[in-house]
Amino acid sequence: MRPQDVIEWWRMSRASVIEILAKSSPGKKLTWWKNEIDCRTFAVTKLAETWAHSLDVYDAMKKDYEDTVRVEHVALYGWLNAEQASKVNKTKYQDLRVELIGPEYKAWQFGDEQSENSIKGNASDWCRVVTGRVPKGHKLTLSTEGDFAKKFVKFNHVKI
């Protein structure tokens, strides 16, 4: 396939996704990869997927990738997808609180403050965990509280 054909295919696919999302309410269910997913989660997942593939490209070029505040969408994806990740890893889901510091020292929190399970730390590490993009040998800066949170960080997260 010629490069211009790939770009045209991508533009048409993107337009199709935008059209579907524009006509849908946030809670409407869509079928995606054999699963039911609401429109909001689908949109956030597509953003996370694009970010994750950008990491792959930078990795192939042996260049460092610097996250921006826009990585917040990937962080949200990780939290929204926690229950599904639990199913894939055959672990009973428990409420999870996530507290992150992102680029430009932005603070992001997801989940119930009263949760017995929490993960805190650097947003870049969290995002790489939930997209299956932790480089070999990388020491995570995430701290966990609760058995489920400890397991969650070690899950085999689906590489999107």
Question: What is the meaning of each model-derived region?
Answer:
Residues 87-125:
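Glycine/small-residue-rich hydrophobic helix-like segments
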Residues 6-9, 13, 42-46, 74, ...:
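Amphipathic alpha-helix face/heptad-repeat signature
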Residues 114-160:
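C-terminal interaction segments
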Residues 1-18, 22-23, 64, 69-71:
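Short, helix-capping/interhelical loops that line the mouth of catalytic, cofactor-
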Residues 59-65, 88-90, 131-140:
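Short helix-capping/linker segments at secondary-structure and domain boundaries
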Residues 1-8, 29-40:
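Acidic/His metal-coordination segments adjacent to aromatic residues that form catalytic metal sites
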Residues 22-30, 101:
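Acidic-glycine-rich active-site phosphate/pyrophosphate-binding loop
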Residues 32-87, 126:
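Short, contiguous alpha-helical
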